[in-house]
Regions:
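Structured, helix-rich domain cores that form ligand/interaction pockets
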Residues: 2-5, 12, 16, 58-293
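Alpha-helix N-cap/N′ positions at the starts of helices
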Residues: 5-6, 30, 48
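Short basic helix-loop element that most often maps to the first helix and adjoining turn
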Residues: 8-27
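Short glycine/serine/threonine/alanine-rich loop segments
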Residues: 19, 30, 59
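Recognition helix of helix-turn-helix/homeodomain-like DNA-binding domains
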Residues: 29-45
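DNA major-groove recognition helix of helix-turn-helix/homeodomain DNA-binding modules
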Residues: 47-62
Length: 293
């Protein structure tokens, strides 16, 4: 990337995150006036200065890591879909579209955006709630309007004797703290100490039409643990995913990397139980990571 383009992106990112020139200059060990001249294109940015500025900005990011619920699949031992929708989820059933098909062998479902509640005439199947990534973000907005949190919702799920089929916890790295290609190389060399015995690292190849065909233009993904197990990690360069899906330049992506903890069945239940008991999503997520890696 040319100097002028790099410093333009740097300044835009600094301002978008509300970080002052004074703060960046102090951390980078340069004067505010010097940084001003760099950002206005009056002076060229050397490779050494570029690295110092990038490191300073990374240090000053507000909340460089944030955690969110990114997937929920829960089965309720009841056939009363209205109770689940209106009393537990606190949505209006009349606002949901009813479809005469479902997933996971359910016969029908109620849909509101990406929020899906599935039903079946078979009592043992009960009512199934599925929220994928977009569904979680949409339901988060409803929770905000209801003055509730995920923890309060999960506590209600437990009261309903819900069976947790899958829960994903996602840690967004906004500052590029995780060096995923480096982690992939460490695993390839057998230098990763983990309870897991399975590692899979690869680079996505869907970027050839957007960037030059070389490894540097591809996003790295690392799976720690078997994808067939009830617990595994997926770590990937989210910025490259946004480049492919939305055409957002890597340097402009709000989230650089993502660390996903994917839990199924009993693993999902115990994670939710810990989350509800401690009321600290961060402690639950990093506790799982520290236990297995």
């Amino acid at each position: 990337m040319e100097n002028n383009e790099w410093i333009w992106h740097f300044r835009e990112e600094r301002e978008r995150n509300g970080i002052s020139r004074k703060a960046v200059a102090a951390v980078a060990g340069i004067s505010r006036e010097y940084l001003c001249r760099l950002e206005t294109g009056k002076l060229p940015v050397t490779d050494k200065t570029r690295k110092r500025l990038a490191a300073a900005l990374k240090t000053l990011y507000p909340d460089p890591l944030n955690l969110m619920i990114d997937y929920v699949r829960v089965r309720f031992p009841t056939m009363d879909a209205r109770h689940i929708i209106e009393d537990v989820l606190r949505l209006k059933m009349n606002y949901m579209a009813q479809e005469d098909h479902g997933l996971y062998s359910y016969s029908s479902m109620y849909v509101l955006g990406d929020i899906a509640v599935m039903t079946s005439p078979m009592e043992e199947k009960g009512v199934l709630l599925e929220l994928k990534g977009k569904g979680c973000r949409q339901f988060e907005a409803y929770l905000d309007g209801q003055k509730r949190s995920w923890i309060e919702l999960f506590r209600m799920f437990l009261d309903e004797k819900a069976v947790f089929k899958r829960i994903d916890l996602a840690i967004n790295d906004r500052a590029g703290i995780l060096d995923i290609p480096y982690l992939c190389d460490k695993c390839d060399r057998g230098e990763c100490i983990s309870v897991f015995r399975s590692f899979k690292a690869y680079r996505t190849g869907g970027l050839a039409h957007l960037r030059e065909e070389n490894k540097e233009s591809m996003g790295a993904t690392l799976y720690i643990g078997s994808m067939q197990s009830d617990l595994y990690f997926c770590i990937y360069e989210k910025a490259y995913e946004q480049l492919v899906k939305k055409g957002i330049p890597v340097e402009d992506a709000e989230v650089k990397n993502r660390f996903e903890i994917r839990l199924k069945n009993d693993r999902a239940f115990y994670a939710v139980y810990d989350l509800v008991s401690n009321e600290s999503p961060e402690d639950t997520a990093f506790g799982i990571i520290n236990r297995y890696v």
